[in-house]
């Protein structure tokens, strides 16, 4: 079974910036990867403090250009995600496979780091590697250029995970595209004040449906020709 993939839709200063896609190494760090996946989907619901246990709406608190991004600080008042914190899983994966390597902070709770360069032995054995950014590194580098960090490593403009979730298959990508198309249609409709109508619809299980459609057209044409010849 293929490793799961999750996504972050980012905004910079409230404006859509783009999407990054992350492959989780569930085959090697199953518990920690599953923990991260659940935080992306928000399936754990609301925590004891009344806050969603979800990366959606959270910010990247620290961004060091060409070094690392730190995010995921969503646990309030040391509220655990599980009944107890996860033990550090496997350190068999290292940080030399960057850039784009993602690892969990020492607490193994919700905080994570995206490494923008090869770290090597500096953090190996301390942070559990759980995945890697497979799409969107160029986007992150462009954001680094736009967001000039302060001496405290805090971005000058808020970088927010506006939406996140799991990409289970190609249907998730279609939903993402349809969501953006839907927004565009709504905007155009509001401006033009014209209704959006589904002129026709149906299911095409395979190529036979197309053939049946063509056959029906041919039969209809033949019937019309017969009537025409009858009256003529």
UniProtKB/Swiss-Prot annotation:
Name used for this protein in its record: Peptidyl-prolyl cis-trans isomerase CYP26-1
Keywords per UniProt: Chaperone, Glycoprotein, Isomerase, Membrane, Rotamase, Transmembrane, Transmembrane helix
Pfam families noted in UniProt: Pro_isomerase
Keyword set includes Isomerase: yes
GO molecular function: peptidyl-prolyl cis-trans isomerase activity
Record EC number: 5.2.1.8
Chief location: membrane
Organism: Arabidopsis thaliana
Top-level EC class as recorded in UniProt: isomerase
Signal peptide residues on this chain, from the entry's feature table: none
């Amino acid at each position: 079974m293929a490793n799961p993939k999750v996504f972050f839709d980012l905004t910079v200063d409230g404006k859509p910036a783009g999407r990054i896609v992350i492959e989780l190494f569930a085959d090697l760090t199953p518990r920690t990867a599953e923990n991260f996946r659940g935080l992306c989907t928000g399936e754990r619901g609301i925590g004891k403090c009344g806050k969603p246990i979800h990366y959606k709406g959270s910010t990247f608190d620290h961004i060091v250009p060409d070094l690392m991004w730190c995010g995921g600080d969503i646990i309030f008042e040391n509220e655990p995600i599980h009944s107890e914190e996860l033990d550090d899983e496997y350190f068999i994966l290292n940080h030399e496979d960057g850039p784009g390597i993602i690892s969990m902070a020492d607490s193994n709770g919700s905080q994570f780091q995206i490494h923008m360069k090869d770290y090597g032995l500096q953090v190996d054995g301390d942070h559990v590697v759980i995945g890697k950014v497979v799409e969107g590194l160029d986007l992150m580098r462009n954001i680094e250029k736009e967001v000039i960090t302060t001496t405290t490593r805090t971005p000058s403009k808020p970088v927010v995970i506006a939406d996140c979730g799991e990409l289970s298959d190609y249907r998730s990508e279609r939903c993402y595209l349809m969501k953006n198309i839907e927004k565009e249609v709504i905007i155009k409709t509001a401006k033009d004040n014209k209704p959006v109508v589904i002129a026709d619809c149906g299911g095409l299980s395979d190529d036979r449906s197309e053939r049946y459609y063509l056959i029906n057209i041919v039969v209809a044409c033949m019937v019309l020709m017969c009537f025409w010849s009858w009256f003529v």
